[in-house]
Structure formats: structure tokens, C-alpha cells
Amino acid sequence: MYLMKDITRDGAKVLRETAKPVTFPLSDEDKQLAHDMMAYLVISQDEEQNEKYHLRPGVGLAAPQVGQSKAMAAVLVPGDDNEILFKEVLINPRIISNSVQHAALAEGEGCLSVDKDVPGYVVRADRITISYQNEAGEHKKIRLKNYPAIVCQHEIDHLNGVLFYDHINKEHPFTIDPDAVIIK
């Protein structure tokens, strides 16, 4: 299981590189990576475990964030009443289509790899379709909207060497299209 000390911080070269594709069948090392990234998310979202291990809660974790230049990310988006909106390890993910409609989180975005607060709207597509492989190597395609779509775009950005604050308008950080969806 990963702890906060294992999270690669902003400034590390691996966070700005394009991650390498993952080959199948998965190596034991890649299986462990997938397991450990998802385990971090599960434990970080459990209040008691989070406190015990001094973790920052997360909804996504990409391999570059643990120092691995591999195109793999774990996503665990909780909903209301312990419902899970989306839980998957995405391997070699690609956004194959996106909506014209924009969206942003009202509170802005954060990142386990970025310790400072960076205020501003991170403007993203409100709806996306992604293709990826699961841990068994099966090719999948899924359509996501709102918060799960934003989380997946954030994680896929990590695999392309992009950090959330790269999307914030430097001159006017809270400027956004008036038709954009603001997710609270």
C-alpha cells in the first residue's frame, strides 16, 4: 500500500513525461502497481483508515504519481450513501470523444502530487468517452459525465505530463464560459 511519502511531488520529472504504454499480459509488478494504487484510494476514502495512515483523500491516482512512467491510473469516485459512481483501473486510456459543453468544479481541483493550493477553474469537457484496457487486458469503452468525467480527465492528463493547474487561465483564473456546468 502506498503512503503519502510514496506520492511523487510536483517538480519531479516523471510528472511531466508522457507515460509509456503498458503491455499485456500484465507483469506481476504491474498487477501490484494496479492493486496498490486502488488500495490507496479505498483506504484514503475511509475516514478511520485515512486518519490511521495520515493520508490525503483521493479519487484518482496515476502511475506517474508513484514514480512509475506507465499508462495506468486507478479511479474511485464515490457517490452518495456509500454508492460508488465509478471504480476502475484504467490501462492505456485514451479520450476518444468529448462534449463541446464545458464543466469545472466549483471548488477547483487539487492533486495528491501538488501540495499548494492553486485557485481557479480547471475547465474540462463535461462528457467524455474513453477507451482503455482493464487488468485482464479486455478493451473497454465507457461514457462518463460530470464529476467522474472530470476525475478521469485529470488522471489521463497525468499520463500525458499535464497537471491540473496547466488548464487554469493565468490572467483570470475564475473566467469560464457562461454556459459551462459548475459542479458543486
Swiss-Prot record:
GO terms for biological process: co-translational protein modification; translation. Its EC number is 3.5.1.88. Binds 1 Fe(2+) ion. PANTHER family: PEPTIDE DEFORMYLASE (PTHR10458), PEPTIDE DEFORMYLASE 2 (PTHR10458:SF8). It is an enzyme of class 3 (hydrolase). One of its GO terms (molecular function) is peptide deformylase activity. Its cofactor is Fe(2+). SUPFAM superfamilies: Peptide deformylase. It holds the Pfam family Pep_deformylase. NCBIfam families: pept_deformyl. InterPro entries: Peptide_deformylase, Peptide_deformylase_sf. Belongs to the polypeptide deformylase family. Keywords: Hydrolase, Iron, Metal-binding, Protein biosynthesis. Removes the formyl group from the N-terminal Met of newly synthesized proteins. Requires at least a dipeptide for an efficient rate of reaction. N-terminal L-methionine is a prerequisite for activity but the enzyme has broad specificity at other positions. This is Peptide deformylase. The active site is at E155. Gene3D superfamilies: Peptide deformylase. Fe cation binds at C111, H154, H158. It catalyses: N-terminal N-formyl-L-methionyl-[peptide] + H2O = N-terminal L-methionyl-[peptide] + formate.
